[in-house]
């Protein structure tokens, strides 16, 4: 009888130890899953940063023949297709600004066109010439 009791106690101890190991393995698996999820989030963030940097590099690349960036050339092509002439003063100032995106270039050109339109509409006062 004592032998059966000993075997029962040993069996319970073995079951208890094995269940403890399984809990540790489950906990380790959860920790690894959390770590992998964190790594995937980091990879997604780094991929987004990399794509933004690639876009900046593309926008900053300068065409040596005209000394303008790709986004400036693209916006000027849009104006050319629309048969809108841009004064050379605006283009020279735009090149010196080194704008980053096509939207920035477009906004700058439109602002300058509005300014020069208003400036060119000014009239000389009649009493100024005598």
Curated annotation (Swiss-Prot):
<comment type="function">
    <text>Binds to the long stretches of ssDNA of the viral DNA replication intermediates created during the protein-primed mechanism of replication of the viral genome and attaches the viral DNA to the membrane of the infected cells. Required for the redistribution of replicating viral DNA from the initial replication site to membrane-associated sites surrounding the nucleoid. Required for the second pull step of DNA ejection.</text>
</comment>
<keyword id="KW-1032">Host cell membrane</keyword>
<keyword id="KW-1043">Host membrane</keyword>
<keyword id="KW-1133">Transmembrane helix</keyword>
<protein>
    <recommendedName>
        <fullName>DNA replication protein 16.7</fullName>
    </recommendedName>
</protein>
<feature type="site" description="Involved in dimerization">
    <location>
        <position position="116"/>
    </location>
</feature>
<keyword id="KW-1194">Viral DNA replication</keyword>
<comment type="similarity">
    <text>Belongs to the phi29likevirus gp16.7 family.</text>
</comment>
<keyword id="KW-0238">DNA-binding</keyword>
<feature type="site" description="Involved in oligomerization and DNA binding">
    <location>
        <position position="120"/>
    </location>
</feature>
<keyword id="KW-0244">Early protein</keyword>
<dbReference type="GO" id="GO:0020002">
    <property type="term" value="C:host cell plasma membrane"/>
</dbReference>
<dbReference type="GO" id="GO:0016020">
    <property type="term" value="C:membrane"/>
</dbReference>
<feature type="region of interest" description="DNA-binding">
    <location>
        <begin position="70"/>
        <end position="130"/>
    </location>
</feature>
<feature type="transmembrane region" description="Helical">
    <location>
        <begin position="1"/>
        <end position="20"/>
    </location>
</feature>
<keyword id="KW-0472">Membrane</keyword>
<keyword id="KW-0175">Coiled coil</keyword>
<comment type="subunit">
    <text>Homodimer; homooligomer. Interacts with DNA; one dsDNA binding subunit is constituted by three p16.7 dimers.</text>
</comment>
<dbReference type="GO" id="GO:0006260">
    <property type="term" value="P:DNA replication"/>
</dbReference>
<dbReference type="InterPro" id="IPR009595">
    <property type="entry name" value="Phage_DNA_replic_GP16.7"/>
</dbReference>
<dbReference type="GO" id="GO:0039693">
    <property type="term" value="P:viral DNA genome replication"/>
</dbReference>
<feature type="coiled-coil region">
    <location>
        <begin position="18"/>
        <end position="57"/>
    </location>
</feature>
<dbReference type="GO" id="GO:0003677">
    <property type="term" value="F:DNA binding"/>
</dbReference>
<dbReference type="InterPro" id="IPR037211">
    <property type="entry name" value="Phage_DNA_replic_GP16.7_sf"/>
</dbReference>
<keyword id="KW-0812">Transmembrane</keyword>
<dbReference type="Pfam" id="PF06720">
    <property type="entry name" value="Phi-29_GP16_7"/>
</dbReference>
<keyword id="KW-0235">DNA replication</keyword>
<feature type="site" description="Involved in dimerization">
    <location>
        <position position="113"/>
    </location>
</feature>
């Amino acid at each position: 009888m004592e032998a059966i009791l000993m075997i029962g106690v040993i069996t319970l101890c073995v079951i208890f130890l094995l269940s403890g190991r399984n809990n540790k393995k489950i906990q380790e698996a959860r920790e690894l899953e959390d770590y992998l999820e964190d790594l995937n989030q980091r990879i997604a963030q780094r991929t987004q940063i990399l794509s933004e940097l690639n876009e900046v590099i593309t926008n900053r690349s300068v065409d040596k023949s005209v000394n303008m960036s790709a986004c400036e050339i693209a916006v000027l092509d849009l104006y050319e297709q629309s048969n809108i002439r841009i004064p050379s003063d605006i283009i020279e100032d735009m090149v010196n600004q080194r704008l980053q995106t096509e939207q920035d270039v477009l906004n700058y050109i439109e602002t300058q066109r509005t300014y020069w339109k208003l400036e060119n509409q000014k009239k000389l006062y009649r009493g100024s010439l005598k």
